[in-house]
């Protein structure tokens, strides 16, 4: 039986979100060019054809007008309008990206205050996949799998993953009633190692290396028949 990984695709690219949040210096043209090259062409066209208020409200939806975000909104809008007034945005929106869809990756999220890593993994997995986590067999006897890397924004990140097994007849889809999933996730599915490697963006080398490590680990189990009876049609997915 083929080993498959559960992957999710973000609704928006990380750099589209960073741009709308004003996470750039308005005169750093090289940085801005870099950000736009990592967006999708659809996102670039949205920026080209809409004002900042529309883009902000579409991205953040019901939370867009919350008081705690108004300072960031005003700062980001001022930067956006500066780029527009000085014709910088015109040049940026002429960029043709190599990417047609946002980033693919594994379910993950940010810990709440005082939340344990495993509890965060279970919560975020449920929110992003809409799967009943109680039906998954988490491999608690394994060490967590860590991914340390520098993001496209230049910041250091550390992701902690947990391995879980799931029956291969488990279906996944975007559920309209799951607001968390609808806000953040654009697509979801089971993919072979070969498919998954080709779907992850090539500059995400640490994520590809992580996928390779897990795949080799599972193949080792398969051939040695130590803990998991793969004859029972088992595939695997990752949690964070």
Question: What spans do the regions from the language model cover?
Answer:
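Nudix hydrolase/Nudix homology domain
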Residues: 17, 33-38, 42, 46-47, ...
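Active-site micro-motifs of SAM-dependent methyltransferase domains
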Residues: 13-15, 127, 198
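Eukaryote-specific, low-hydrophobicity, charge-rich regions
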Residues: 7, 77-101
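The catalytic Nudix box helix
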Residues: 100, 105-142
């Amino acid at each position: 039986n083929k080993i498959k990984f559960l992957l999710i695709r973000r609704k928006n690219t990380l750099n589209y979100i960073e741009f709308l949040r004003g996470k750039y210096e308005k005169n750093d043209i090289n940085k801005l060019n870099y950000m736009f090259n990592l967006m999708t062409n659809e996102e670039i066209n949205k920026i080209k054809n809409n004002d900042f208020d529309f883009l902000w409200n579409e991205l953040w939806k019901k939370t867009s007008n919350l008081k705690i975000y108004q300072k960031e909104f005003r700062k980001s809008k001022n930067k956006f309008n500066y780029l527009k007034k000085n014709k910088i945005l015109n040049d940026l929106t002429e960029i043709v990206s190599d990417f047609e869809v946002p980033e693919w990756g594994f379910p993950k999220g940010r810990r709440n205050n005082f939340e344990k890593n495993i509890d965060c993994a279970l919560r975020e997995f449920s929110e992003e996949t809409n799967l009943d986590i109680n039906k998954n067999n988490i491999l608690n006897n394994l060490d967590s799998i860590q991914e340390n890397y520098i993001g496209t924004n230049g910041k250091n990140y550390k992701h902690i993953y947990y391995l879980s097994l799931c029956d291969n007849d488990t279906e996944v889809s975007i559920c309209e009633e799951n607001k968390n999933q609808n806000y953040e996730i654009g697509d979801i599915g089971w993919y072979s190692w070969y498919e998954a490697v080709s779907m992850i963006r090539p500059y995400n080398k640490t994520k590809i290396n992580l996928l390779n490590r897990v795949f080799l680990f599972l193949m080792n189990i398969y051939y040695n028949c130590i803990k998991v009876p793969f004859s029972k049609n088992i595939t695997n997915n990752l949690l964070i």
